[in-house]
């Protein structure tokens, strides 16, 4: 019996110690969990977003565009309309209705609805910035704020070459504007937050980092100097905000690389500094009045540097300086390498073009020039464009895709097609590079102002008389 009592006493002592240890371990573990939770508590973007979201708007577009469709089988088309051999040269049929119109195609106005995003940048004036491709061909623009308020909006200015547009909300009060950050200070790896209206869902937020800076060569816009981010950007995000963790605007979301139509983590935004420079011109002039450096150039790569025996790896190689241009008067020469602009490194010709393309006429800037192994700085004042080139879409929203300039060649005045983009309204009408518009609706065109005055009257049909080489043809837009 005594032996049993001893055993029982030992068991009770063991259980007491075990229970005591378990309680002690449990309390210690509970305390440790509390400490870990407090340390690992993730920061939230909510406070920043609460400040930023009221400045981001959803945009609803009602518009129309001209659609050209063929009435004849492809094999018969060469025998009809202005391209027919019966309509060329001194043919007696050249000015007939048969040749003046294009019986091969039907033209019709097709209505459409589109969605996009925008960002309020001036609360007092109710100005918001978005992409040009969001509002082009718009007949009606309606915006919705984060608090549900809706307003009509009108276009203040737009620029198809950079894909930036400035709109104004009508009769809008008590708005919240975003601050535009200095995008020149951005670094690869900085955190980004994209805000917009993808697929019409309304306010949507995604996050990521800056994957690359100064992206170009994408053939999305004429002036390309994109911020690349892996923050998810989808359809409807165009024109929306790309912000930093302070809630400052660093870019306007513009495009994605999407082989299958969806986000794969490669999105592009127009830098905030370019947005600021262009919208300031739109407020002042109603359009972008670019200065021109007056050079022709190319990217500097290792092969070119080796052949030219240039001790430089990055920059904009100057292959030609146009007479009487800004570059000419600053002493820039063919063979020079432009390596900086206002002390900011220039890594490519595309980057130089984008930087200069956002600056207005009469801007003075400092260029770093590498020549004969020595870098020196020169001051350049931007002159007006020698070609006075503008986008046809900027003066007439019904036809996009052609760059125009005043022309006077061998006594023939008119408006010259400097460039043409494939699969645009201008190319479908039939315009080609180097065409010269000499008449519209039987009214003589001597310059861009003449063309703009006729297009501003918004006629139901446009019959363009065009000089193409030694031939005269007619192109029709209905």
UniProtKB/Swiss-Prot annotation:
Record domain PDZ: where: 281-372, 387-469
Q: Which family does it belong to?
A: Belongs to the peptidase S1C family.
Active site, renumbered? 133 (charge relay system), 163 (charge relay system), 238 (charge relay system)
Q: Does the keyword Signal apply?
A: yes
Q: Which cysteines are joined by disulfide bonds?
A: 87-99
List its EC numbers: 3.4.21.107
Q: Which EC class is the enzyme in?
A: hydrolase
List the molecular function annotations (GO) for this entry.
serine-type endopeptidase activity
Gene Ontology cellular component terms for the protein in this record: outer membrane-bounded periplasmic space
Cited Pfam families: PDZ, Trypsin_2
One GO biological process this protein is involved in is: proteolysis
Specify the protein name.
Answer: Probable periplasmic serine endoprotease DegP-like
Coiled-coil intervals, chain numbering: none
Task: Give the UniProt subcellular location, in the record's own words.
Answer: Periplasm
What does it do?
Might be efficient in the degradation of transiently denatured and unfolded proteins which accumulate in the periplasm following stress conditions.
List positions binding substrate.
236-238, 293-297
Reaction equations catalysed: Acts on substrates that are at least partially unfolded. The cleavage site P1 residue is normally between a pair of hydrophobic residues, such as Val-|-Val
Q: Residue ranges of region Serine protease?
A: 116-254
Keyword set, alphabetical order: Disulfide bond, Hydrolase, Periplasm, Protease, Repeat, Serine protease, Signal, Stress response
Signal peptide extent: 1-26
- Where on the tree of life does the source sit, at the highest rank? Bacteria
SMART domains for this protein = PDZ
């Amino acid at each position: 019996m005594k032996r049993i009592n001893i055993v029982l006493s030992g068991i009770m002592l063991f259980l007491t110690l075990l229970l005591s240890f378990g309680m002690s371990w449990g309390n210690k573990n509970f305390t440790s969990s509390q400490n870990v939770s407090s340390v690992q508590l993730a920061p939230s973007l909510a406070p920043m977003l609460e400040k930023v979201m009221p400045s981001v708007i959803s945009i609803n577009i009602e518009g129309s565009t001209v659609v050209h469709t063929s009435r004849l089988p492809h094999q018969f088309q060469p025998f009809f309309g202005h391209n027919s051999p019966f309509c060329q040269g001194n043919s007696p049929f050249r000015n007939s209705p048969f040749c003046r119109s294009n019986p091969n195609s039907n033209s019709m106005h097709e209505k459409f609805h589109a969605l996009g995003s925008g960002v309020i940048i001036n609360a007092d004036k109710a100005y918001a910035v978005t992409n040009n491709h969001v509002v082009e061909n718009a007949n009606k623009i309606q915006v919705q704020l984060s608090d549900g308020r809706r307003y009509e909006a009108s276009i203040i200015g737009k620029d198809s070459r950079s894909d930036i547009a400035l709109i104004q909300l009508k009769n809008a009060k008590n708005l919240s504007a975003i601050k535009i950050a200095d995008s020149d200070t951005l670094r690869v790896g900085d955190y980004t937050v994209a805000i917009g209206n993808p697929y019409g869902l309304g306010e949507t937020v995604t996050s990521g980092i800056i994957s690359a800076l100064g992206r170009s060569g994408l053939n999305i816009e004429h002036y390309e100097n994109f911020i690349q981010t892996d923050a998810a950007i989808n359809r409807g995000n165009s024109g929306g905000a790309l912000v930093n963790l302070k809630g400052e605007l660093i870019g306007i979301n513009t495009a994605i690389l999407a082989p299958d139509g969806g986000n794969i983590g490669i999105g592009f935004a127009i830098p905030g500094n370019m947005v600021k420079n262009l919208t300031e011109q739109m407020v002042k002039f109603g359009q972008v009045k670019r200065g021109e450096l007056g050079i022709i150039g190319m990217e500097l790569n290792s092969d070119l540097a080796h052949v030219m025996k240039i001790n430089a790896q990055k920059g904009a190689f100057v292959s030609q300086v146009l007479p009487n241009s800004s570059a000419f008067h600053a002493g820039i020469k063919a063979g020079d390498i432009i390596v900086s602009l206002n002390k900011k490194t220039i890594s490519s010709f595309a980057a130089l073009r984008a930087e200069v393309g956002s600056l207005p006429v009469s801007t003075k800037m400092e260029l770093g020039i590498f020549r004969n192994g020595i870098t020196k700085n020169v001051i350049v004042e931007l002159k007006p464009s020698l070609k006075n080139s503008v986008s046809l879409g900027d003066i007439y929203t019904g036809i996009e895709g052609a760059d125009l300039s005043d022309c006077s060649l061998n006594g023939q005045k008119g408006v010259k097609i400097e460039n043409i983009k494939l699969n645009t309204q201008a190319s479908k009408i039939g315009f080609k590079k180097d065409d010269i518009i000499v008449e519209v609706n039987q009214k003589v065109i001597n310059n861009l102002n003449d063309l703009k005055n006729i297009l501003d009257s918004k006629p139901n049909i446009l019959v363009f008389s065009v000089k193409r080489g030694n031939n005269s043809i007619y192109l029709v837009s209905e």
